[in-house]
UniProtKB/Swiss-Prot annotation:
Domain of life assignment: Archaea
Organism of derivation: Pyrococcus horikoshii (strain ATCC 700860 / DSM 12428 / JCM 9974 / NBRC 100139 / OT-3)
The protein's name in its UniProt record: Probable GTP-binding protein EngB
Function: Necessary for normal cell division and for the maintenance of normal septation.
GO terms of biological process kind: cell division
UniProt GO MF annotations: GTP binding; metal ion binding
PROSITE patterns in the cross-refs: G_ENGB
Alphabetical list of Pfam families matching this protein: MMR_HSR1 (PF01926)
Keywords: Cell cycle, Cell division, GTP-binding, Magnesium, Metal-binding, Nucleotide-binding, Septation
Family note: Belongs to the TRAFAC class TrmE-Era-EngA-EngB-Septin-like GTPase superfamily. EngB GTPase family.
Statement: the UniProt record of this protein carries the keyword GTP-binding: yes
Length: 216
C-alpha cells in the first residue's frame, strides 16, 4: 500500500496566515500505531468524531484503515503484539505489513502518534527486559525515529495512572528521550474520558507545521 502524493491540499490555518506558499503544502498524513487494545481507535474517534472498528478483544483492527479528517489523512495501523485468536505466523505477517508500509511511506508521513497504555506499559517493559528482549513499544519508537518520522507518544488511560509524571519519566528513560524533549514527546491522555485531547491535537498540528515548513 503506497500513499499517493497526488492527494495534496493545504492544511487548515487561520485565514490571515494563508498565502500562496501554504497552498503548495501537501495534505498532512498522520499515522496512529501501538499495541493491541491500548485505545488507539477510541483516541481517533475522540480526535476526529469518526468511528473505526474497535472492541475489547486485542487485535480487532487487523487492516490498515484510512480516514479523512479536516483535509488530513489519518491512518489507523493494526495493533502490534498479542492478537487473541490469531496464529503466531499471522501476527508476524501483520507486524511485517506494518513495518513495510511505514518504510515505504516514511517520506510522506508528517507525524506518528504512538499510543501506549500508561498503566500497563511499565510492567510490560520490565517483563520484556527481564527476558533480555527489547520491549516492542521501545523498538517501535526507535524504528520511527530512525526513519526520521516525528513521533508523539500518547500515554493513554490517564484516569488509571496513580503517578503520571513517574510513568512518563520511566518511559522517557526507556525510550531514550532527552529531558528537554519530554513535554513535546509524551502527552498523557484519557481517550475514554477525553482528558488532554486538545493538548494532543495542538501538538499534532504543531509538528505538522514544523514538518511541512521544512518541505517548502
Amino acid at each position: 500500500m503506497k500513499l499517493s502524493t497526488a492527494d495534496s491540499i493545504f492544511f487548515f490555518l487561520p485565514y490571515e496566515f494563508i498565502n500562496p506558499i501554504i497552498l503548495l503544502i501537501p495534505m498532512a498524513t498522520i499515522i496512529f500505531a501501538g499495541r493491541s487494545n491500548v485505545g488507539k481507535s477510541t483516541l481517533i474517534y475522540r480526535l476526529t468524531g469518526k468511528k473505526v472498528r474497535r472492541g475489547k478483544r486485542p487485535g480487532v483492527t487487523r487492516k490498515i484503515i484510512e480516514i479523512e479528517w479536516k483535509n488530513h489523512k489519518i491512518i489507523d495501523m493494526p495493533g502490534f503484539g498479542f492478537m487473541m485468536g490469531l496464529p503466531k505466523e499471522v501476527q508476524e505477517r501483520i507486524k511485517d505489513e506494518i513495518v513495510h508500509f511505514i518504510e515505504d511511506n516514511a517520506k510522506n508521513i508528517d507525524v506518528a502518534v504512538l499510543v501506549v497504555d500508561g498503566k500497563a506499559a511499565p510492567e510490560i517493559i520490565k517483563r520484556w527486559e527481564k527476558r533480555g528482549e527489547i520491549p516492542i513499544d521501545v523498538e517501535f519508537y526507535q524504528f520511527l525515529r530512525e526513519l526520521d518520522i516525528p513521533t508523539i507518544v500518547a500515554v493513554n488511560k490517564l484516569d488509571k495512572i496513580k503517578n503520571v509524571q513517574e510513568v512518563i519519566n520511566f518511559l522517557a528513560e526507556k525510550f531514550e528521550v532527552p529531558l528537554s524533549e519530554i513535554d513535546k514527546v509524551f502527552i498523557p491522555i484519557s481517550a475514554k474520558f477525553g482528558d488532554n485531547i486538545e493538548r494532543l491535537k495542538n501538538r499534532i498540528f504543531e509538528v505538522i507545521r514544523e514538518r511541512q515548513g521544512r518541505r517548502v
